[in-house]
């Protein structure tokens, strides 16, 4: 489903093809200091010998003809995106994707392409992250779902600079090319749900708070909450925010109060602290904005200031508060 390849310059006496046992080869190279290594390959026996300044190491490979063939591009569409932009867009969304194989469409990142912008979306049905990039111009309007495993591999190898990644895609595969590296992944062949339907449009209650203070408070309070539900309750009254959690079975309870800037009706709403913490950790602005409509509808979390050419929106579904049903 995912293939990564790269090229490098070597000094070779002839052309040869062989499949190398990756783990043994990598472990050997990792254990060597930085020095030239000589490979001697006998294709008829699938034999490989590594030679370093310290000694010789023999291992058996496989016939290169038995190696799975890399899908050819045959791309119907293509566009370029700054490598750093692609990396950050993946990092900002992938943590919010699901793991339920019965809901396969939610296990990846949904990419919507427009002529002059691109949108990345991920959700596990309890939370959602949407990143819009206005500095990407695909020149085509389409969409596809990229699998999580391939995106994690891509993210860990993308350069964090101003270089460009070329993205080619057709109905079944996506092809990423940057530097000497190419990655091919099979697209998730599922229909993505209409995520826009769960984003509340009218959110008259707006809260602005220091992200770090809020994050640390939620971390402390969650220690005392129920470990099954991870629920914390947030009550907003005027310019004061109260965070509360308890585990009735173990008689544990904690409460903290923080100052905030709030406009709207007094409200109490419940959230999953584990999900909230992860979302706050994936924001970088000093302050965040939380927009609310009612205790029974999703909360919108926004950075107080978006970085250039980026619009970021996070959504977290509420949890029912006992006595408010």
PLM features: residue spans?
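Structural preference for solvent-exposed beta-strand-turn elements
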Residues: 1-325
């Amino acid at each position: 489903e995912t293939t990564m390849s790269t090229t490098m310059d070597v000094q070779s006496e002839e052309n040869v093809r062989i499949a190398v046992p990756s783990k043994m080869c990598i472990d050997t190279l990792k254990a060597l200091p930085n020095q030239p290594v000589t490979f001697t390959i006998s294709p008829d026996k699938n034999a490989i010998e590594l030679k370093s300044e310290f000694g010789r190491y023999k291992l058996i490979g496989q016939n290169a003809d038995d190696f799975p063939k890399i899908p050819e591009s045959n791309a119907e569409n293509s566009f370029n995106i700054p490598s750093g932009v692609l990396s950050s867009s993946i990092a900002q969304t992938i943590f919010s994707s699901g793991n339920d194989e019965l809901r396969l469409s939610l296990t990846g990142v949904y990419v919507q392409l427009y002529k002059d912008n691109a949108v990345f979306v991920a959700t596990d049905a309890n939370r959602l992250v949407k990143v819009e990039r206005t500095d990407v111009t695909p020149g085509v309007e389409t969409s596809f779902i990229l699998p999580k495993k391939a995106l994690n591999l891509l993210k860990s190898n993308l350069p964090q600079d101003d270089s460009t990644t070329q993205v080619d895609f057709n109905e079944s595969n996506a092809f990423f090319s940057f530097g000497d590296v190419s990655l091919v992944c099979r697209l998730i062949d599922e229909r993505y749900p209409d995520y826009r339907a769960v984003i509340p449009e009218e959110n008259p209650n707006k809260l602005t708070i220091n992200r770090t203070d809020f994050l640390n408070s939620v971390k402390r309070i969650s220690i005392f909450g129920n470990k099954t539900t991870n629920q914390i309750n947030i009550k907003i009254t005027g310019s004061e925010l109260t965070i509360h959690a308890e585990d009735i079975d173990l008689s544990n309870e904690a409460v903290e109060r923080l100052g905030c800037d709030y406009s709207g009706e007094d409200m109490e709403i419940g959230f999953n602290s584990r999900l909230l913490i992860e979302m706050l950790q994936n924001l970088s602005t000093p302050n965040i904005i939380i927009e609310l409509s009612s205790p029974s509808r999703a909360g919108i979390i926004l950075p107080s200031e978006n970085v250039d050419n980026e619009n970021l929106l996070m959504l977290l579904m509420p949890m029912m508060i006992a006595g408010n049903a």
